[in-house]
Curated annotation (Swiss-Prot):
Boundaries of every Peptidase S1 domain copy: 25-261
Keyword annotations: Disulfide bond, Hydrolase, Protease, Secreted, Serine protease, Signal
SUPFAM superfamilies with a match to the protein in the record: Spermadhesin, CUB domain, Trypsin-like serine proteases
Similarity annotation: Belongs to the peptidase S1 family.
Signal sequence region: 1-16
Protein name per Swiss-Prot or TrEMBL: CUB and peptidase domain-containing protein 1
Amino acid sequence: SGFHLSFSFFRRAVCGIRPTLSGFIVGGTVAPINSWPWQAKLRIAGNFLCGGSLIQPEWVLTAAHCVEGESPSIIKVTLGAHYLSTAQVVGTEQYFDVVQIIQHENYKMPKRFSNDVALLKLSRPAALRNGVGLVCLSDDQFQRPFNGTSCWTTGWGRLSWPGPVAKELMQVDLPLVSPQNCLSSYPNGYDPNTMICAGRSQGGTGACRGDSGGPLVCEFKGKWYLEGVTSWGQLPCDLPNKPTVYADVRKLKSWITGKISRSPALKVATNCSSVLNNTLKSPGYPDSYPINMFCVYRVPIPCDTELVIHFNSFHLENHVFCWYDRLRITDGSNRVIGTYCGQQTGRSVLVNDTVAVLTFKTDRSLNSSGFHLSFSFFPRGNATLLPFTTPTQTTTQRPTTTPTPGCGVVQNNTLRSPGYPSNYPRNTHCVYRVF
């Protein structure tokens, strides 16, 4: 019968490369946009939590004290970001759920912040492109610059103590401090086996509250290496002879690489359904879908064609952030088009790329009837989105449905919000791409 092959192309993962440039950052400057491509931003329940560093396409390294006792389902990771606020974007952002937290088993032993590292496994590999890249792990072949050569730390932490957090990513260059001097500064808290220090003896610069988990990087032979993970320091954050203390990545490298190599790959469930006749139904539909599902569906889109996904029926466990059960739609570049849960029957979603990737994930508790989707292909620029009916309820009358337009498309170089000039509907997520 011969063979049927498919070809996928991926950029080779190269670490430590940043653009050529002409916890808490005190006394630093605003970083040029996308100048530190491994910088991660962690949020919990919608609020900024900590920084982190992308060390593998699926792995972010952060501080253990940032995620201690937290569930992976409530932590969100953003890569390629510059602004602290999620309302301000630069266009290179990639958004991720966390599926696993691996905290160092000896965190807080023997000192309070010993072994202050944790690994976050992302829900999918990051796309290594504009503004998103890997940092190299510290390498023993390079001698550390304890002679005063500066390294750099970055973050959205406080600009002073007490003081506000940064609205944009900040950077500051700091010299590494020898273990002897660090021990002199912190005779009771410093652990030379798991910590490294950086800062100026005169003070005035350093990391602060909100920078925790972020990177301390040094350049060797044209590449940037992660030497430290921002951990702790003395308040206020800019005291003389009180450097910032970081988890020592070089000392902890074997733990980091060992945990990553032993972590099982995210497995796709064997009982996932299939796309048949341009239709996709969740496993078990119309009965309840199983718990603990992880299914990935790839829908190729022919050249000069765009895809409309119509939600004929859609009922998943609801949550304001879709933390529990969800369907996520991304394009071929890992750009998130939308994340959906709750009741979404009647919605239409436009995908204008070479492929649509649908990821269906469920948790271990409540479930619902699932979804029934249909796929329609149109010549590029000619897609029609069906109206999306949003249920509304009042306490005085029977629930009614109010038709509102779908997301629509750009036509004649014009784009109108759904419902314009009337009010746009609530709980709407629209993505428009202008080529």
